[in-house]
Curated annotation (Swiss-Prot):
Record-annotated BPTI/Kunitz inhibitor domain positions: 31-81
Modified residues (Pyrrolidone carboxylic acid): Q25
One GO term describing the cellular component: extracellular space
Segment forming the signal sequence: 1-24
UniProt keywords, alphabetically: Disulfide bond, Protease inhibitor, Pyrrolidone carboxylic acid, Secreted, Serine protease inhibitor, Signal
Keyword Disulfide bond in record: yes
Superkingdom of source: Eukaryota
Subcellular locations according to the entry: Secreted
The name this protein goes by in its record: Kunitz-type serine protease inhibitor 2
Protein source organism: Daboia russelii (Russel's viper)
Amino acid sequence: MSSGGLLLLLGLLTLWAEPTPISGQDRPKFCFLRPDFGRYGHPRPRFYYNPATNQCQGFLAQRSRENTNNFDTRDKCRQTCGRK
């Protein structure tokens, strides 16, 4: 395969790997809550949806009254609030 064909294939795979974000109207309301960092316990890595950047971002949460914009993995965050 020529280098041009490989570049085209790579470009198509890149487009396929980054789906279009869903609209804000399709997201649950809790996706727009600010992250709750907590106050007690050992910090652990978590992810929350940031509507300002339209991305799921990592943070360290401690156990307390965490809100529902708080996910174990980036994939769970994206499936619920971000990219479909």
